[in-house]
Amino acid sequence: MVEGRRRRRFSLSSQQLALLLLLLSFFLCFSVASPRAISDSDLLDETVANSSSSVASLNASSSSSLVKPKEGSFADIIDRALEKEFNESDQNEVADPGSFNNSVAGQQAVLETVARVKSTKKNETKEEKRFQLHDVFNLNNDNRAEDTPTLIDRKDNVFIISNSKSKYPVLQLDLRLISDLVVVIVSATCGGIAFACAGQPVITGYLLAGSIIGPGGLNFISEMVQVETVAQFGVVFLLFALGLEFSTAKLKVVRSVAVLGGLLQILLFMFLCGITVSLCGGKRSEGVFVGAFLSMSSTAVVLKFLMEKNSTNSLHGQVTIGILILQDCAVGLLFALLPVLEGNSGIVHGMLSIGKVVVLLLSFLAVLSILSRTCIPWLLKLMVSLSSQTNELYQLAAVAFCLLVAWCSDKLGLSLELGSFAAGVMISTTDLAEHTLEQIEPIRNLFAALFLASIGMLVNVHFLWTHVDILLASVILVIIIKTTIVTTVVKGFGYNNKTALLVGISLAQIGEFAFVLLSRASNLHLIEGKLYLLLLGTTALSLVTTPLVFKMIPAVVHLGILLKWFSPDSTIEKGEIVRSESGKQRMILMSRQSHSS
């Protein structure tokens, strides 16, 4: 018995000695290093294999030294019962299809060295840091849960572990993501309040708040990819709410300019930019891409502005929305066009890809049209009957339906925006469209603010300030060219000067989706690095200045009246519907009915 106690004490002292040596090695590493943050190159010298083997040996030594309860005691009975219930196969990790070996073998992965970064605690450092404002947003609480590990490869790419393996199922929290979301939402709220008090559009406050806290500003956000992914729900719910307010009767009035005019303005941009670049001695493929890039407008920003001004039901608002929806439908076509412009795939292959997208789009819309007439009314009535006491279930069902249709659209190679808008249009054909809109509005407003703030985070303030001269000139040129082309196209469909000009100004910016299009073209080596930076900065500055352009619309309208471009008594809601013979007949019929009543 005494010998057993001695062995137990010896095992405990050896464990303590191992831990002491481990802490001493960490202390020596930190004492040799400089007091600054550990760089990636310093960390890359350690391999994952060595670190994992040391941790495994430490776990083995600690598990072998566990004190077992006394034989025959109540604790021993419980211990044996637990061992019988939970055997070794349940406790050990089982290799699943996503394990390391299967991933390497099945996906032709390349084994490379990465560094695993963990946050240091206060008692592990010898020197105390000075207080910085950035430390307020760092999670340095000793009582918090374990921070999410970070991996860095040799190219300085940072990866956040999404599913850390554990012997037992435990609740995993990404506290940095929670902190980032809190910072973004609070900053967007403060920015919106400040600009609302100043009488300015709250959109500007959201964008400016995002640029301040983003990597180009104070760099308060750690997980950009995760925050931007969550913020993408803002576009989804914005277009879902737009679809709920959509009217097929109003669409029939503007469908020609929305479909044909939207396609015409995209083709005009591609043709003019391609010809201009060819005349200047550049690559025609780059010019065509720049034209497609410039033709895209910001759906989220424009819709937010129209909703704030209650202009979604106006004629120029309906035309603007129709063209924006057409641009969202053309996203898949533009993606299919990029390999053709790059030159690796032939024209025939490119045409087949575009034809495939068109067939998928038409088939998808046909299936949704059938479902909207058969299943959707019955499903909504069922949700209403089940939500008699509270609207919680109906609200959840509406959100789930929107996300499901958007997900299906994305899986078919179309866009999330198109799917979410189609989901709203499906419900708009029923009697519960207004009720659904009331339930979805709070969620839409929250995620819309989050999305606009995430757009602001893409703006690098230092980069914009360094190249403000050329970027500002590029933005002014984009505004003038887009306003001129869109106004000319809308005017060509029989609309008067005022409506055409308002539509042109509303679409005179580069959309946030252009970031995705630009990154895809860069990966295909379709454009050079200098052009990439120019387009990136122009897009960012264009989104920031868009609310200011919207603020100038009343002044532009007043100037148009002074220059007699359009009559002062023309309205947006009624008088401008007279654009064709059928429109004139409808207006005459309405006036006769009003006189007879």
Swiss-Prot record:
Annotated function: Electroneutral K(+)/H(+) efflux antiporter involved in K(+) homeostasis and osmotic adjustment. Together with KEA4 and KEA5, promotes growth and development, and facilitates endosomal pH and ions homeostasis, as well as salt tolerance (e.g. K(+), NaCl and LiCl), probably by supporting cell wall biosynthesis during rapid etiolated seedling growth.
Record bears the keyword Transmembrane helix: yes
Keywords: Antiport, Golgi apparatus, Ion transport, Membrane, Potassium, Potassium transport, Signal, Transmembrane, Transmembrane helix, Transport
TM helices/strands, residue ranges: 177-197, 201-221, 224-244, 257-277, 287-307, 321-341, 351-371, 396-416, 440-460, 461-481, 499-519, 543-563
Membrane topology reported for the UniProt record: Multi-pass membrane protein
PANTHER family assigned: K(+) EFFLUX ANTIPORTER 6, POTASSIUM/PROTON ANTIPORTER-RELATED
Consequence of gene disruption: No visible phenotype. The triple mutant kea4 kea5 kea6 is compromised in cell wall biosynthesis and has small rosettes, short seedlings, and is sensitive to low potassium K(+) availability and to high salinity (e.g. K(+), NaCl and LiCl); it also exhibits a reduced luminal pH in the Golgi, trans-Golgi network, prevacuolar compartment and vacuole. These phenotypes are partially suppressed by the cell wall-derived pectin homogalacturonan trigalacturonic GalA(3) in the dark but not in light conditions.
Catalytic activity: K(+)(in) + H(+)(out) = K(+)(out) + H(+)(in)
pH dependence per the entry: Optimum pH is 5.8.
Triggers of expression: Down-regulated by high K(+).
Annotated compartments: Golgi apparatus membrane; Golgi apparatus, trans-Golgi network membrane; Prevacuolar compartment membrane; Endomembrane system
Pfam family, one: Na_H_Exchanger
Family statement: Belongs to the monovalent cation:proton antiporter 2 (CPA2) transporter (TC 2.A.37) family. KEA (TC 2.A.37.1) subfamily.
Signal sequence bounds: 1-35
Species of provenance: Arabidopsis thaliana (Mouse-ear cress)
GO cellular component, one term: Golgi membrane
Tissue-level expression: Expressed in roots, stems, leaves, flowers and silique.
Record's protein name: K(+) efflux antiporter 6
Gene Ontology MF terms: potassium:proton antiporter activity
